[in-house]
Amino acid sequence: MSNFLYANDSRATYPLSWYAQSSGDTPLRAALDQPVSSDVCIIGAGFTGLSTALHLAQKGFSVTVLEAHRVGFGASGRNGGQMGSGFNQDQRKLEKTMGQDAAHRLWEMTQDAKSLTRSLITQFAPEADYQPGIAEADFSPKDRDNSHAKAAHLEKNYGYGEMECLDTSTISDLIKSPRYSGGLIDWGAGHLHPLRYALGLAKAAETAGAIIYEDSPVLQVQEGSPNILQTDRGQVKANYVVHATNGYHCSLNRKQATRVMPINNFLVATAPLENPQSVLTKNIAVADNRFVLNYYRISDDNRLIFGGGESYGTKFPQDIFTKVRHPLTEIFPQLANIDLTHAWGGTLGITTTRLPMFARVGHQQLTASGYSGHGVALAGFAGLVLAETIAGNAARFDLLSKLPGPAFPGGQLLR
């Protein structure tokens, strides 16, 4: 069992995040404590697993979801809440890797992913409060010019005209920071409360007939007909298995473990701001172009939710407040003395190419993971694609499975 599941968190308990505090009372679901059988067993109740469960249940499959902790416990319920466009790789580079035809089909899938996310929120989680707009903030004029060229390329070659280019003056009007030289706003992207979205998906999946067990970590998957999944107190026999664990993959499957690396990211929430427009003048999210990027937005109760800093080890730093305060005050020196009320970390999954991993990893066992920071849209869409595949239509899965993703050097040993 991977230490990532328990190294930084108490069992079956949400982290002390602003997201958890602002999501209301969420009673713990029952743990699996007996043998059960279903058509499909899904490991993990994040966006991928919950969307897969919902779409399979709507198709009439019997579905069991096993979650080691709580619904939305992992990256799905801890992230910056930003639903970006495309993959975490420039579309121009993807064209060179995959060819023009495949690149265009993949872009359309990422557009479908955003549309699906907005639709699921409207139907099942309006309290997630989706708002349009993500700014990409660039530190140097060279990076700004590259962002503008990207926007022009997407409009000319893909008909995507949702990006508004920003120069030094216009980005300074938008983001009250002296650090940026320009960038763009993607009005086709947006931001939301991720844990409320996950909780809404869970209720929708259960209403459709799926059964979700919390506090039910999977210890072993025995491949066969059927596949057998063993928890610490129960067992599931299932024709199909979906590994929807992302960075918390627990090394349950070697193919996934060698290609998807866990990485930790950290966030804080400030006390409510008296004047949020002293930080952001529009209700958008922002991500800058640092390699270890900073990302932020204003919450519905006027807090700055700010993410910055990362680590590759199992343990989080002892003082996340201090770790994140440094980049926060670098970007917003006017907030040097602001009170920080919440601090938390989370573990996501990345790949060598920063493109997601879609793969068949055993007999009637599928996975989608490694969204590399673009999981808010892609993970829910992956659930739809996994459900389509199990139902007999693997066209989109097969194309996504061709995305390049070599194993990390050292394979599983360096995790």
Residue ranges and their predicted role:
Residues 1-40:
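Extreme N-terminal leader/targeting segments of oxidoreductases
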Residues 38-65:
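N-terminal Rossmann-like FAD-binding beta1-loop-alpha1 element of flavoenzymes
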